[in-house]
Amino acid sequence: MPTEIENINPNVYDRIKERVLTANEEDENVPDPFDKREIFDLIRNINDPEHPLTLEELHVVQEDLIRINDSQNSVHISFTPTIPHCSMATLIGLSIRVKLLRSLPPRFKVTVEITPGTHASELAVNKQLADKERVAAALENNHLAEVINQCIAAKG
């Protein structure tokens, strides 16, 4: 975790209501393709590395910035750091990626990128997040893996 907070007073947004599961969604015999809301529900409660808030509360992740194509096995997440020079952007992106890789079936190709035009180092961060070897190497770093696990751990 950082020793000095970059954005000491971030905007905080209301959480959206929890989704009520339908009988069809709970029935294992009914085909139920993944949708944007289901993906959002997986990442909305990721903890911000700087603040005691979730990525949803900071509008870092939003349902309308998720694209999913269940039949083509692809998920694309755009996330928006709270400030354009956020040094935590790569860590946030890694946390989103790890949460989805651990939660979704392995058939999915997961892409995590910064929302275009919202970060000073957008291209460099996106390149790091897209590089499977760099992501794997980052997760082999015990300290970094511990921080990511803290971000994706459920509170309470």
Curated annotation (Swiss-Prot):
Biological process (GO), any one: protein maturation
Disruption phenotype: Embryonic lethal. In 0-2 hr embryos, mutants display signs of incomplete chromosome segregation during mitotic divisions likely due to defective organization of spindle microtubules.
Segment forming the signal sequence: none
Keyword Phosphoprotein set for record: no
Entry keyword 4Fe-4S: no
Superkingdom, taxonomy of origin: Eukaryota
Gene Ontology CC terms, in alphabetical order: cytosolic [4Fe-4S] assembly targeting complex; metallochaperone complex
Keywords, sorted A to Z: Cell cycle, Cell division, Chromosome partition, Mitosis
Miscellaneous comment as given in the Swiss-Prot or TrEMBL entry: The name 'galla' means splitting in Korean and is derived from its role in chromosome segregation.
Record's subunit section: Component of the CGX complex composed of crb, galla (galla-1 or galla-2) and Xpd. Interacts with crb (via intracellular domain). Also able to interact with Xpd in the absence of crb. Interacts with Mms19.
Similarity comment: family membership: Belongs to the MIP18 family.
Role: Component of the crb-galla-Xpd (CGX) complex which is essential for proper mitotic chromosome segregation in early embryos. The CGX complex is also required for cell proliferation in developing wing disks. In the CGX complex, acts with crb to recruit Xpd thus forming the functional complex.
Protein's name in the database: MIP18 family protein galla-2
